[in-house]
Amino acid sequence: TQVNNIFFGSTISNDGFPKDEFDFMLSNPPFGTSWKAELKAWGDIKKDEITDSRFLIEYDGNPEYSLIPDIGDPQMLFLANNISKMKRSTDLGSRIIEVHNSSSISTGGAGSGTSNLRRFIIENDLLEAIVALPQNMFYNTGISTYLWIVTNKKEDKRKGYIQLIDASELKASLRKNVGEKNCEITPKIRRQIIDLYLAYKDADSKYSMVFKNEEFGYYSATVNRPLRLKVEVSTDRIELLRNQLKDEGVVEVLNKYCEDQGDAISYDFNDFMEHITHISAKCGVKLTAKRKKLIRDFFSAVDEKGSIVLDAKGQPELDKNLKDTEKIPLLYESGIDGYWENEIRPYLPDSWIDKESAVIGYELRFMKYF
């Protein structure tokens, strides 16, 4: 009987249908509530100790690709659960409709569990459409909500594309509020939304737009800037070094430097260190890595007027305080290199993008399009 298909407990930590697949799956998961209780139910484990194959999958060469969201919001766990139960060997496959708030479509940076699930869904061409619903549709919250329409058997014309439908203003007011709920979607409005969906690329662009899957993807990459240092050596600072650290070898080398240069300010750290290395060799003082760091920390300071500091291989050292992250669209013409050339270099000509840091992320920001 149907009642035997109802299981007590949490869908997340106690899967009542571990081997079943379904034609249709509807879900209205909780918004923005902690799911710490699930960790306790799993055996009082930590988030990074989850091994459930619904939420930790093999993808993109990673045997432990995580679809696990932040502990404060379980919505994407419910979506991942349903995706794991899609029929893959039938002509019609499966269809999922879920109601989510805005966090599931846009929060979570590249590489996070939430973004990873969006990436998995979109790169596997499972996302057919997202429908923005009116605000104040629910009794206990006025927040914006969205329908995810997911299927593994798209029509040919929809393959490789995602439809965004903005139905946020398609609503009828209630004569009397019911909690936060002050509007509804009538059968007539429901028909209007369905017609927008069916019209697909021919739908009114005020309410519906269609994009390639890659439109919503981006590289999150680190933009580095070089370290620039000013060096200031004086007899007073050398004496301060002597009193604090009592390294007579370094003091001897620095005193020789002052004899040659006087109390001096240099904006070329590499030239300064070459001079120090030459003096230390003449004095028979071994310039260890520890002593080099001591001199650098004690006598140099970041200064944008300084020359670029080079490492032992002659490559620019990065200034960690100037490190930034840039989102580069997957569809940007000429890719990461072109983005740096056109969008970053004109303003930061000494910068460079660390390509090894690039991580693919996906987000669906309705406000960008409507």
Which ranges hold each PLM region?
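A conserved structural/catalytic subdomain of Rossmann-like adenosyl-cofactor enzymes
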Residues: 13-15, 19-370
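Conserved SAM-binding strand-loop segment of SAM-dependent methyltransferases
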Residues: 2-9
